[in-house]
């Protein structure tokens, strides 16, 4: 298994099987009954990556302490001698059930899998664990939500970081695992299928989630092999080698290397996970708090849309073919801080997939779109919702070239399109939070040009170098597509063409030169 990974899941399954056989062989001489060797955590899911810990529970029913010590030495010590990172716990039935009051132990036990020994013992413990966790699902999910928020704050809350954490980052493997655990506590069965049956995610969502998860698992195996340790961060220094291990090849030019292609695949997979998790999690936690059958959730209505538990729904009687529907959705989601519900997202995605759509641009829709961008960071989530459904590219076809596109540049933190939306959000936040910026904005007679210039400043990076030049015709096409007045279009072109002027001057010229200052001001 050392060479891999053509397929990360196959690699993990093969390595898991090797460890299973070793544990079974080691346990056989000391197993006198009422003993079970149980794989938990990632090992229980059969997702052992090269640098993963092998987490084992030695479960017993009435063994004496001395005999247990002999069993641990026989089962665990040889694996340590083989340089495996083995973590273990020894518990009886009662202890194993009580231990799930600790969140990390609970999540590990939700993925418990029999390796060898007394299967009935594990089954009885599993029933007790499920019963204990299901008594207070809100407590478990509150703790899991806090843990998820903590890890995102630590490693980054954006699914398009240029050095992503494959396990703990937004849209990472842990987000899918959290959904599986939530199903176990709320619905009594761990996995994605129970969430489909209960309506939290759709069958197409499940398929997309599995594909995205498997892509990240393959990346994680390759990253562990290249780094030589359990490092879950896909750092710049290993991206080229990881890309080759994952089967990517170089394209044409410095912006289409194997590593760029790997990162683009990762960004789109992470977005899929991030959106599915965010959409389902609000409903799952609300149902855990108030009861799935007992509660009558509070509803709000914005425009023609319904908002329940932070999830926005377009009622079935409301046509999605209205020319300004996406713009109204964007405005409503921003105003209500909501995400699209599963059915609405599916309707929109199906409409995009059907081909030609009825959504158009004119002065009112363009003004509504830009008014959302001026809301700053509040617009990022709603824009991402339209991106996930394909509506954004349907509205702006030229956006397809930058969607999920990697830019391996230490001066940037995100994918090309995410960088553009963050730049627009930064402008919106600036004028909302800083008085001097708001005053300066009042003196600008074409705010459309300013916002569009910021949004489109790097659009040329998908079309060759120098990107400040290649971006000009693309920006012009987009402005004309949006129906911008010619004067606005010209100003956007100029902003795109000269967006590197000030940073270049600031880093290469004498800023005390009065003549230089006048020259730049005239430009």
What do these predicted ranges mean?
Residues 455:
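Walker B beta-strand of ABC/ABC-like P-loop ATPase nucleotide-binding domains
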Residues 1-452, 462-523:
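A nucleotide- and high-energy phosphate-metabolite-utilizing enzyme signature
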